[in-house]
Amino acid sequence: MYLHKNKKGFTLIELMVVVAIIGILALLGLRLYAGQQEKAKNSIVKANAGTIQTLIQAELADKAVEDIDDESEMNSIVTKAGIHNPILGSQQTASHFGNAAPSASTDNAGDVYVWLNLSDSVFHVNGWGADGNDVYADDLTARR
């Protein structure tokens, strides 16, 4: 009696090669996806900075610079904006307001900050990205 071998299916080597290829593709996809997430979060920070700039400009239409040049007034504007920090996952309620540009900060990543140049009464608005650096190379400005 002659035994007929049934050769259906894949060998172990073939299966291991396929699994290795799928693993490599998955790792490449995850690296690209992680980079896209950071870019998206930085885009939200840019949009938040634009919102704050618009609100400051609207306030300056009705008030003098001296009427909104303190931290409590800036915090009120930021709170009124209802902006969401995409990196920390919370609502931003403080403006990090000052009279000079703050240094890079990973503690406040995702927050928008405002500073006032006292010499020319120009408000500068920017935000910290996921890496703690500014999202805009040049600050957005608002003036009367």
What is each PLM-predicted segment?
Residues 1-10:
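N-terminal leader/signal peptides at the extreme start of proteins
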Residues 10-19:
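N-terminal signal-anchor/signal peptide hydrophobic helix marking the start
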Residues 11, 28, 43:
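Conserved Walker
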Residues 22-39:
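C-terminal juxtamembrane segment of a hydrophobic transmembrane alpha-helix
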Residues 35-79:
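Conserved hydrophobic/amphipathic alpha-helical signal-anchor segments
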Residues 61-131, 143-144:
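Extracellular/periplasmic head regions of type IV pilus-like filament subunits
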Residues 137-139:
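Edge beta-strands of extracellular beta-sandwich domains
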